[in-house]
Swiss-Prot record:
Reaction it catalyzes: a carboxylic ester + H2O = an alcohol + a carboxylate + H(+)
Gene Ontology terms, MF aspect: carboxylesterase activity
Protein name, UniProt field: Esterase FrsA
Organism: Vibrio vulnificus (strain CMCP6)
EC number: 3.1.1.1
Hydrolase among keywords: yes
Gene3D superfamilies: alpha/beta hydrolase (3.40.50.1820)
Length: 415
C-alpha cells in the first residue's frame, strides 16, 4: 500500500467520524453501577482510562521513545475531554485524541516504508500495523474509530507480509456457516513445520503477534498460526460464549489439511484470556496437542470472586460488556454471570489431568492471574509447571517468560 493510497484510505475511513463518540463514553451503565464506577475511579486515582501496556507494546515492536512522545501529546492536549481526570479521553478525531495520535504514528511508519524496499519496508509496515492496532485499543465493538483503525492495521499487515522474507498466508477456515480468518507464518515451505496456535486476549488483535514469530519461533523453524478470540478482530462476528475455545478447536481440527504444517506436532500459546481458551482446548483435544504455554491468564479466581470483578477499572468492564454484546451494563449481574467462565466451575480443573504439559506463567501481583490460578493449572496437567515472574524486573521478566515459553514448546515439538 503506497503512502498516497494509505493517506487516501485513512481520510476516507475517518472523514465521517470527526465527531465520533469518545471510547470511554460508549458503554452505558445502570445508575447503581455508575455510582460504583465513580467510587472505583476516585479510589484508584488513575490518570488514564486505558490500561497503558507500555512494556508489552515495546516488546511487540513499538519504539519506546515514539510511544512516550505519543502519550505526551495525548496528555498535554488542550482539547475537551469526556472526563478531565482521564488524559486519553479527548473528544473528536484530531490532535490529542487517542486514535488520532496512534494512527498518525502508524502513518509515519507507513511513509517510511514507502522509501524502503524488501525487509526494511516490511518491518516498517509491521510497525505501522501495530500502531494502528493500538489506535483501536481496547477494540470496543461500538467504537467507530477503532473499527477504522483495525482496517488500517489489517491492510498494513498484509502489505508487510508481501515484502517479508518470511512466508505469511491468510487462511480462511470453514466454521459453522462462515469462515475463521487466521494467519500462518512460516520460515519456508520446503517441508511441514511444527506449528504453534497463538491467541491474544479480549482487547488485542492477532496482528499484534508478529514479533513473537520473528524473534522467537522463526529461529527454531516453528510455524505460527494466529487466531482472534471470538468477538474480537477477524472473529468479531462470532459471539463470546462459555464455549470460547471453539474457534481455536475448529482451526486445530483443520490443520491436517494444511500442507505446510505437521499436525502431529502442535503447541499452543495464549496471552490473557486467550490463555484460558488454550487451557480449555488442552483438555478437550489432548490427543492433538503436544504442549501449551499461558501468560497472565485469568483461570478461576477473578471469575469466582464477584467483589474483585466489581472493583475492576472501567476499561476492563467496558471490554467484557462489549464482548458479551451488552448495551446497558449492570456490574453486579455481570460479575455473577462471569462465574461460568471459570475453568474450575466448568469442570476442567476438578478431577482428571490433561496429558498436555502446560506451563502457566504470570507477573507477581497480577490481580487478573494470581499464582494460585497457575498452580491449579499445573496441578491438573501432566508435567505441568507454574511460574511467577518477578515484577521488580518486569522488562527482563517479559523476555525471560518468552524464552521459557519457547524452550517449553521446543522440548515437546522438536524432539
Amino acid at each position: 500500500m503506497s503512502e498516497e493510497v494509505s493517506k487516501n484510505l485513512s481520510e476516507t475511513l475517518f472523514v465521517k467520524h470527526k465527531q465520533a463518540k469518545e471510547t470511554s463514553a460508549l458503554t452505558q451503565y445502570m445508575p447503581t453501577s455508575q455510582s460504583l464506577l465513580d467510587e472505583i475511579k476516585e479510589k484508584n486515582g488513575f490518570s488514564w482510562y486505558r490500561n497503558l501496556r507500555r512494556l508489552q507494546w515495546v516488546w511487540q515492536g513499538v519504539d519506546p521513545i515514539e510511544q512516550e512522545q505519543v502519550l505526551a501529546r495525548i496528555a498535554s492536549s488542550k482539547h475537551s475531554r469526556t472526563d478531565e481526570q482521564w488524559l486519553d479521553t479527548v473528544m473528536g478525531y484530531h490532535s490529542g485524541n487517542w486514535a488520532y495520535e496512534w494512527t498518525r504514528l502508524g502513518m509515519e511508519h507507513q511513509k517510511r516504508a514507502g522509501e524502503m524496499t524488501n525487509e526494511a519496508a516490511s518491518e516498517a509496515l509491521f510497525s505501522a500495523s501495530l500502531c494502528y492496532s493500538i489506535a483501536g485499543y481496547p477494540h470496543l465493538k461500538s467504537d467507530n474509530l477503532a473499527i477504522q483503525a483495525q482496517v488500517l492495521a489489517n491492510s498494513a499487515y498484509l502489505e508487510a507480509a508481501k515484502k517479508s522474507k518470511y512466508i505469511i498466508k491468510q487462511l480462511e477456515i470453514p466454521f459453522e456457516k462462515g469462515k475463521i480468518t487466521a494467519h500462518l507464518h512460516l520460515t519456508n515451505t520446503d517441508k511441514p513445520h511444527p506449528v504453534v496456535i497463538v491467541s491474544a486476549g479480549l482487547d488485542s488483535l492477532q496482528t499484534d503477534m508478529w514479533r513473537l514469530f520473528r524473534d522467537h519461533l522463526a529461529k527454531h523453524d516453528i510455524a505460527m498460526l494466529t487466531v482472534d478470540m471470538p468477538s474480537v478482530g477477524y472473529s468479531s462476528k462470532y459471539p463470546l460464549t462459555e464455549d470460547y475455545s471453539r474457534l481455536h478447536q475448529a482451526v486445530l481440527n483443520e490443520l491436517f489439511s494444511i500442507p505446510y504444517v505437521d499436525h502431529h506436532r502442535v503447541g499452543l500459546i495464549g496471552f490473557r484470556f486467550g490463555g484460558n481458551a488454550m487451557v480449555r482446548l488442552s483438555f478437550l483435544e489432548q490427543e492433538k496437542i503436544k504442549a501449551c504455554v499461558i501468560l497472565g491468564a485469568p483461570i478461576h479466581d477473578i471469575f469466582a470472586s464477584p467483589q474483585k470483578l466489581q472493583q475492576m477499572p472501567k476499561m476492563y468492564l467496558d471490554v467484557l460488556a462489549s464482548r458479551l454484546g451488552k448495551s446497558v451494563v449492570d456490574i453486579y449481574s455481570l460479575s455473577g454471570q462471569m462465574a461460568a467462565w471459570s475453568l474450575k466451575v466448568q469442570g476442567f480443573l476438578s478431577s482428571r489431568k490433561t496429558k498436555v504439559p502446560i506451563l502457566a506463567m504470570s507477573l507477581e501481583g497480577d490481580p487478573v492471574s494470581p499464582y494460585s490460578d497457575n498452580q491449579m493449572v499445573a496441578f491438573f496437567s501432566t508435567y505441568g509447571k507454574a511460574k511467577k515472574i518477578s515484577s521488580k524486573t518486569i522488562t527482563q521478566g517479559y523476555e525471560q517468560s518468552l524464552d521459557l515459553a519457547i524452550k517449553w514448546l521446543e522440548d515437546e515439538l522438536l524432539r
